[in-house]
């Protein structure tokens, strides 16, 4: 059973983008390859439980176990030694990716306080989109009573688009709520 957004991509988005950009092959049409959720935890230096709580939150949000990212080199100013755990990240591909994107667009983004749409300028020049979430409680899987602290996370959407214009058209076709 494929995800709802995956079927929507094949049936509606691909023909729409072929018509808009004049692609000759279906394989030329940009698609989302992966979504990476990253939670940087600077406060984990003092308290090791922070990593456990953040990992638990990401498991609930993504539906799979994240990896703990470690410091590549020591930075005395931040009191970090090489190998210290400083964050968690999870990479979603395939069906889980489409299911997460569906939940994110339809349920989570409207729950953001004072939400007026996401910025259309957060593309990196190579067709990838980044969005920062200030609080993990916008996700319905996170119970407000059971969190220890509000943490933000970075969501990176990687596409096969050659430029930002194609990537924005792809995300617009997925009904991504851009404000500009």
UniProtKB/Swiss-Prot annotation:
Keywords from the UniProt entry: Ribonucleoprotein, Ribosomal protein, RNA-binding, rRNA-binding, tRNA-binding
Keyword tRNA-binding tagged: yes
SUPFAM superfamilies: RL5-like (SSF55282)
GO biological process: translation
PROSITE patterns: RIBOSOMAL_L5
Domain of life: Bacteria
GO CC annotations, alphabetized: ribonucleoprotein complex; ribosome
Record-linked InterPro entries: Ribosomal_uL5, Ribosomal_uL5_bac-type, Ribosomal_uL5_C, Ribosomal_uL5_CS, Ribosomal_uL5_dom_sf, Ribosomal_uL5_N
Keyword Acetylation: no
GO MF: rRNA binding; structural constituent of ribosome; tRNA binding
SUBUNIT field: Part of the 50S ribosomal subunit; part of the 5S rRNA/L5/L18/L25 subcomplex. Contacts the 5S rRNA and the P site tRNA. Forms a bridge to the 30S subunit in the 70S ribosome.
Family: Belongs to the universal ribosomal protein uL5 family.
UniProt cross-references to PANTHER family, sorted A to Z: 60S RIBOSOMAL PROTEIN L11-RELATED
Entry function: This is one of the proteins that bind and probably mediate the attachment of the 5S RNA into the large ribosomal subunit, where it forms part of the central protuberance. In the 70S ribosome it contacts protein S13 of the 30S subunit (bridge B1b), connecting the 2 subunits; this bridge is implicated in subunit movement. Contacts the P site tRNA; the 5S rRNA and some of its associated proteins might help stabilize positioning of ribosome-bound tRNAs.
Record protein name field: Large ribosomal subunit protein uL5
Gene designation per UniProt: rplE
């Amino acid at each position: 059973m494929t995800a709802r957004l995956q079927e929507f991509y094949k049936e509606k988005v691909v023909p729409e983008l072929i018509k808009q950009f004049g692609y000759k092959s279906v394989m030329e049409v940009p698609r989302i390859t992966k979504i990476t959720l990253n939670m940087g935890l600077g406060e984990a230096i003092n308290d090791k439980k922070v990593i456990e709580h953040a990992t638990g939150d990401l498991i609930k949000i993504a539906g799979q176990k994240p990896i703990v990212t470690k410091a590549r080199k020591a930075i005395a100013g931040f009191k970090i030694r090489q190998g210290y755990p400083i964050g968690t990240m999870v990479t979603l591909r395939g069906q889980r990716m489409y299911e997460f994107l569906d939940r994110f667009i339809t349920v989570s983004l409207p729950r953001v306080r004072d939400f007026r749409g996401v910025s259309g300028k957060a593309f990196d020049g190579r067709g990838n989109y980044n969005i920062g979430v200030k609080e993990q409680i916008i996700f319905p899987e996170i119970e407000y009573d059971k969190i220890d602290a509000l943490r933000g996370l970075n969501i990176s959407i990687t596409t096969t688009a050659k430029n930002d214009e194609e990537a924005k058209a792809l995300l617009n076709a997925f009904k991504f709520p851009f404000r500009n």
